[in-house]
Every structure is written in structure tokens, then in C-alpha cells.
Amino acid sequence: MLILTRRVGEALMIGDQVTVTVLGVKGNQVRIGVTAPKEVTVHREEIYARIQREKEQANGRGQVSESEFTEEAFRAAPAISGSGE
């Protein structure tokens, strides 16, 4: 694991097309912004895990598109405070 230190307003690059920017720090929470092409999916870890579980469960029931998993996972996800989430 690469460990980096960033201040509010500073960013890091992942490859040539993904930028992660520190937007703010409040207590033990860090707000980040991710800029990535539309074809790159970006999920919170718990949402990604839910999508993967649903994909595994659906394997026996037939094919379902990733967008259907993503939409269902977002509907079931707990709300996060702040704009743009």
C-alpha cells in the first residue's frame, strides 16, 4: 500500500486520467473528490462489495448488467451528508 500525505486542496493522480482531490477534513472524516472518465466506475468500498455480492448471487439466475447492480446498490446505500454524494 502506498501511503501519501495531502493537505486540503491538494490532489493525487492515478494513471493519466483519474484525479483524487482532498476537499476537506472534519474530525475523523476526509471528503475527497474523484475526477475520472465516465467509463471508469468509482464506488465507495461498501457499495463495491455489495455490487460484487449481488453479481455472485445473480450468477445462478442469469445475466444482469453492471449498471443494474450499480443502480440497485445506490438505492440501497445509506445516505451520505454533503453535496454531490
Swiss-Prot record:
Q: Pfam families recorded for this chain?
A: CsrA (PF02599)
Which superkingdom, per the lineage? Bacteria
Localization, UniProt: Cytoplasm
The record's GO CC annotations read: cytosol
Where this protein primarily resides, as one coarse class?
A: cytoplasm
* UniProtKB keywords: Activator, Cytoplasm, Repressor, RNA-binding, Translation regulation
UniProt keyword RNA-binding present: yes
Could you tell me the Gene Ontology terms of the biological process aspect for this record?
mRNA catabolic process; negative regulation of translational initiation; positive regulation of translational initiation; regulation of carbohydrate metabolic process
Q: Which GO terms describe its molecular function?
A: mRNA 5'-UTR binding
Statement: the UniProt record of this protein carries the keyword Electron transport = no
Per the entry, what this protein does is: A key translational regulator that binds mRNA to regulate translation initiation and/or mRNA stability. Mediates global changes in gene expression, shifting from rapid growth to stress survival by linking envelope stress, the stringent response and the catabolite repression systems. Usually binds in the 5'-UTR; binding at or near the Shine-Dalgarno sequence prevents ribosome-binding, repressing translation, binding elsewhere in the 5'-UTR can activate translation and/or stabilize the mRNA. Its function is antagonized by small RNA(s).
HAMAP family recorded? CsrA
Q: How does it assemble?
A: Homodimer; the beta-strands of each monomer intercalate to form a hydrophobic core, while the alpha-helices form wings that extend away from the core.
- Family named by the database record: Belongs to the CsrA/RsmA family.
Q: Provide the protein name.
A: Translational regulator CsrA
Q: State the organism named in the record.
A: Nitrosococcus oceani (strain ATCC 19707 / BCRC 17464 / JCM 30415 / NCIMB 11848 / C-107)
At the highest ranks, the source species' classification is: Bacteria, Pseudomonadati, Pseudomonadota, Gammaproteobacteria, Chromatiales
This protein's gene is called csrA
